[in-house]
Amino acid sequence: MLENLSTEHRNEKTMNLDEMNIKEILQRMNEEDRTVALAVEKEIEHIEKVVRVVIQSFEEEGRLIYIGAGTSGRLGILDAVECPPTFGTDDKMVQGFIAGGLKAFTKAVEGAEDREELAEEDLKSIGLNEKDTVIGIAASGRTPYVIGGLKYANSVGASTASISCNKNAEISKYAKLNVEVETGAEILTGSTRLKAGTAQKLVLNMISTASMIGVGKVYKNLMVDVQSTNEKLVERSKRIIVEATGVSYEVAAEHYEKAERNVKAAIVMVLLQCEYGEALEKLKEAKGFVKKAL
């Protein structure tokens, strides 16, 4: 029942929200937002367990799949689509599904979130298997679409996790690992795109970033698998080589081109003073970890 969910409760601090001036509204929102990171902090041990499972999936050439409805689904897609340019992944490695399909990203599809079978259809369409990890996202913790997806994922032997913003969430029963970030009442009653959505975004940031670090997509704190898909990212790639090696911009640019715009290879070439082919071989032996290749 909705009345039992803390995300649906009325916030005692905003009973007169419609009487506040603009500055008061913004200050109250900011005060409430400050509580979100602290709520996430309480779940770090559970988030860590999820990251370990995702890393295992990646190591076995499995995938990370997010499923959700509404804001939760959109946040999953947002995290997924940022992985290729940031970490050099293909677009299959991390994927997001939203109830109602991609058209629901920009316009609500009525009733889609209430149909468990839609998630099963979505996961079947990508050939979900036991190497994959499925993470169900629902602020309320009770969305049928997410429950259906987790049920199907369990049936094929995939790893499962849930992210919700209520304790003892319904979806937690259907996932092997659970992250329950209790964000409490929103300033606008029931509008879980606010604190709950912020919490979900923070957790997704943690999961994808820590998992990519775990499979060698980062050297020191540099995103060395960045894809140079535009002029800004080409410049960033060269700067990463400068930061990682200490050489001049000109030398970094030269090695960047010699390495066929492979930032990792360029770094190894500079630091080991080797040719492109040898750098690739060392990276292959090190399973993509620059530090191990050196």
Curated annotation (Swiss-Prot):
Q: In which pathway does it act?
A: Amino-sugar metabolism; N-acetylmuramate degradation
Q: Which EC class does it fall in? A: lyase
One of the record's GO molecular function terms: carbon-oxygen lyase activity
The record's keywords, sorted A to Z, are:
Carbohydrate metabolism, Lyase
Tell me the GO BP annotations in alphabetical order.
amino sugar catabolic process; N-acetylmuramic acid catabolic process; peptidoglycan turnover
Pfam families per the UniProt record, alphabetical: GKRP_SIS_N
So what EC number does this one have?
Answer: 4.2.1.126
Which residues are the active-site ones?
E82 (proton donor), E113
Please write the reaction equations for the catalytic activity of this protein.
N-acetyl-D-muramate 6-phosphate + H2O = N-acetyl-D-glucosamine 6-phosphate + (R)-lactate
Other remarks on this protein: A lyase-type mechanism (elimination/hydration) is suggested for the cleavage of the lactyl ether bond of MurNAc 6-phosphate, with the formation of an alpha,beta-unsaturated aldehyde intermediate with (E)-stereochemistry, followed by the syn addition of water to give product.
Q: What does this protein do?
A: Specifically catalyzes the cleavage of the D-lactyl ether substituent of MurNAc 6-phosphate, producing GlcNAc 6-phosphate and D-lactate.
What the record says about family reads:
Belongs to the GCKR-like family. MurNAc-6-P etherase subfamily.
Record protein name field: N-acetylmuramic acid 6-phosphate etherase
Species the sequence originates in: Bacillus cereus (strain AH820)
Record gene name: murQ
